[in-house]
């Protein structure tokens, strides 16, 4: 019999935990947000608050890989033709200093395939680890993330990345 939590329901609620049925999801740890010459910095943001967590994210990733936990990565990345960028999102980005798709030191900002969408080296995906490009905050909207998780028979998610009150929270909800 599984232990009870306050006599209300069995714990763990969803049955025994398994690393193979749990995925680590690394959210938006890409150069456009982390690099001093990336999109976030160009809009007046300070990427040091993001780069400061890189060592801890790298430790979590290393541990997950050691125990055989599948690892997934997300990036905020738009189509080169900008067809998935709502006008209001583009308006906000331009007001901050650089619109989505505008050229910068890392290529066109937040565009799939550009250098700014590369995940930071200390936590770069290994061959076979999926990278989910998403045009918004949630990895479940306008992407194949749900299908990838179902195909891998993932039942539980562990999150690391940026920002907790943005893309991380939107994805976990």
Residue spans of the language-model regions?
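Short glycine/serine/threonine-rich phosphate/pyrophosphate-binding segments
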Residues: 164-171
